[in-house]
Amino acid sequence: MTQAQHDAAPITTGTNQTASVFSFDVRPDKIGIITINVPGEKVNTLKAEFVDQFLNVFKQAQQSSGLKGLILISGKPDTFIAGADISMIAGCKTKEDARDLAEKGQKLFSQIANYPLPVVAAIHGACLGGGLELALACHWRVCSQDDKTRLGLPEVQLGLLPGSGGTQRLPRLIGVSSALDIMLTGKQLRAKQALRLGLVDDAVPLDILLDIAIEKVKKGIPVRKPLPWQQRLLVGPVGRYFLFNIVRKKTLAKTRGHYPAPERIIEVVKEGLEKGMSQGLRAEAVAFGELAMTRESAALRNLFFAATSLKNETGSSEKPAKIKHVGILGGGLMGGGIANVTATRGKLPVRIKDINEKGISQVLKYTWDLLSKRVKQKRLRPAERAQQMMLISGTTDYRGFAQTDIVVEAVFEDLSLKQKMVAEIETNAKPETIFASNTSSLPIHQIAEKAQRPEQVIGLHYFSPVDKMPLVEVIPHQGTSEKTIATAVSLAKKQGKTAIVVGDKAGFYVNRILVPYISEAAHCLVAGEPIDHIDGALVNFGFPVGPINLLDEVGIDVGTKIMPVLVEQLGPRFAAPESLDAVLKDGRKGRKNGRGFYLYAPGPRKFWQFGKRDKKVDSSVYTLLNITPESHMLSSEIAQRCVMLMLNEAVRCLDEGIIRSPRDGDIGAVFGIGFPPFFGGPFRYIDSLGCARVVEILRRLESQYGDRFVPCECLVNMAEQNKSFYP
């Protein structure tokens, strides 16, 4: 609801505080409108200092004679309330400070919930975190059907729980099972999903949102129907016992005990159901205070701030060029993924060139299948699917490329082929067109070597699967112009990606820190450690999958192709054990051909196989490598060997200027390879251990396993000077 839409209704202005976040007006029909508009900000966020302002507005409402009810709307174009201002937590020195913060919000929202007249939240745009908790305190909730409208409680993603009554009001409104699902995942709901769950009372076109809110006020405070019997059953002692046991086990299986917030959410919801709302709110505030002081929450909040700051940067000193049309070379898996995110997220027309029609058809089918899945999930309308599909077209020649502003190349990793692509684009596209290569290993300066306009050649390294992986590495070579850098970053943002600008050197950043990690896992394997023990060690450490499993997923042929390049250009520390060649020679490529270090069941799992793994360790690999699998090392030792090499290489990358800052290195590792977010990234993790401790561990490992563990000079110097990467 915009201010313009608010003003469209006949309004009698009451006391109006223009400098305030909240303004109060009364309509001729005696319905009060409270508009939320944080001055000078793009979106509304809640801060502790706003409480007094809101109470003043509430006081005005109470003094307004004949008032029939209140409607809360936003003065921002596409945001209701994006949540509480997370930076407030940084000002809390103790758990008591953070608890007080939660209690302030609870008391304010309790006043809304207990207001004797109907209060309606008219929601358009993001309604998240504290914004949804505010809406939950209202008697009615109506929202727009607009795609920008999203509702959720994402606090768990910051290592927190909803601290202003959300853990207590949501289960009572929609049932404990659905409420736990929303809070434990941090998922965001669209309007129709929210309506189906009972989170909102109506989802309507934006044009009539205020009208429907007015209707709700006129109906008075609603008498809520009891929840369905299935949900009521779960609130009883027996239902609670089984539900919370199941949820706790599933949650622990996912978090492996690394994240305290999900467990506290479960505890607090359970306490509120067993002991009542008041006790539940007290438990919520205490838990919020304690979680705010945890290392895990600090790490997750730091990542949030890092990612947010990157979104506001162009990566360059210049402004980007406008992007109206995008070209893609190659209709394979990567080309198809890049085309998909460009059209569906960037809403940009995409022209794909492939050597045959089959490649183009594969891209169209790939995007159709992904969009159809969203249609089936009710997250997209069939008409929207059709509109997005119309943005993608294909050709086997260069027709349509004359109007492209940027062309992303996703062909085979062959230098001469990529150089040929540069020449053909320079011939068939306009002079201003940027050429971006999705290479994972070839230096960009070599790809640009024969270009007529090398300043318009850059690397854009996407990660597979493109529709899921959030990171893009932007790789300028020495001659790349600032405008080209800014434009490449701009495209990545339009595609919904987080972009980091990295140096043009073998492996760039992500692959360079990943290869030693995987190679060390291979060293453990050829020494006799079982595959599942190695992978389990790193999953227990906090990675989403183990290194051997990851190699299978990426493709053993693809994953090992970059290793010789790194060995040649950066040294023997990147070398994998020679015996690993036997795996490749045996035709094992990983999941894509059903044979790797694991064996994969063909086809999708049947319904009776739900929960069963679709893969198992292929024991014939041990025969191939001439080893007898037997565990001699603790899981923690295996994890330490693999992770320490990654940390050491990350510091080298910073020292050499491959990454611009520790922040970029942390984002790259977490978003690119799944470095455990609760550590905050490699550099935050080093700071938590201390440089001296990391050097000590590396030297011990060097004495046991060789020169690949020699600590880099930068790390040694920082240890000697007792320095850290962050203030």
Swiss-Prot record:
Please give the Gene Ontology molecular function terms for this protein: 3-hydroxybutyryl-CoA epimerase activity; enoyl-CoA hydratase activity; long-chain-3-hydroxyacyl-CoA dehydrogenase activity; NAD+ binding
Q: Give the main location.
A: cytoplasm
Matching entries from InterPro entries are given as:
3-OHacyl-CoA_DH_CS, 3-OHacyl-CoA_DH_NAD-bd, 3HC_DH_C, 6-PGluconate_DH-like_C_sf, ClpP/crotonase-like_dom_sf, Enoyl-CoA_hydra/iso, FA_oxidation_alpha_subunit, FadJ
Q: Supply the alphabetized keyword list.
A: Cytoplasm, Fatty acid metabolism, Isomerase, Lipid degradation, Lipid metabolism, Lyase, Multifunctional enzyme, NAD, Oxidoreductase
Q: Which GO terms describe its biological process?
A: fatty acid beta-oxidation
In residue numbers, the region (Enoyl-CoA hydratase) covers: 16-205
**Site for Important for catalytic activity, residues:** E133, E155
Describe the reaction catalysed, as an equation.
a (3S)-3-hydroxyacyl-CoA = a (2E)-enoyl-CoA + H2O; a 4-saturated-(3S)-3-hydroxyacyl-CoA = a (3E)-enoyl-CoA + H2O; a (3S)-3-hydroxyacyl-CoA + NAD(+) = a 3-oxoacyl-CoA + NADH + H(+); (3S)-3-hydroxybutanoyl-CoA = (3R)-3-hydroxybutanoyl-CoA
Q: Please give the SUPFAM superfamilies that the UniProt record associates with this protein.
A: 6-phosphogluconate dehydrogenase C-terminal domain-like, ClpP/crotonase, NAD(P)-binding Rossmann-fold domains
What EC number(s) does this enzyme carry?
A: 4.2.1.17, 5.1.2.3, 1.1.1.35
Annotated localization: Cytoplasm
Cellular component GO terms held in the UniProt record: cytoplasm
- From what superkingdom does this record's organism come? Bacteria
Q: Which residues form a coiled coil?
A: none
Q: In which pathway does it act?
A: Lipid metabolism; fatty acid beta-oxidation
- The segment annotated 3-hydroxyacyl-CoA dehydrogenase runs over 321-727
Which family is this sequence assigned to?
In the N-terminal section; belongs to the enoyl-CoA hydratase/isomerase family.
What HAMAP family does the entry give?
FadJ
Instruction: Supply the NCBIfam families for this chain.
Output: FadJ, PRK11154.1
The record's function comment reads: Catalyzes the formation of a hydroxyacyl-CoA by addition of water on enoyl-CoA. Also exhibits 3-hydroxyacyl-CoA epimerase and 3-hydroxyacyl-CoA dehydrogenase activities.
What is its quaternary makeup? Answer: Heterotetramer of two alpha chains (FadJ) and two beta chains (FadI).
The identity of this protein, by name, is Fatty acid oxidation complex subunit alpha
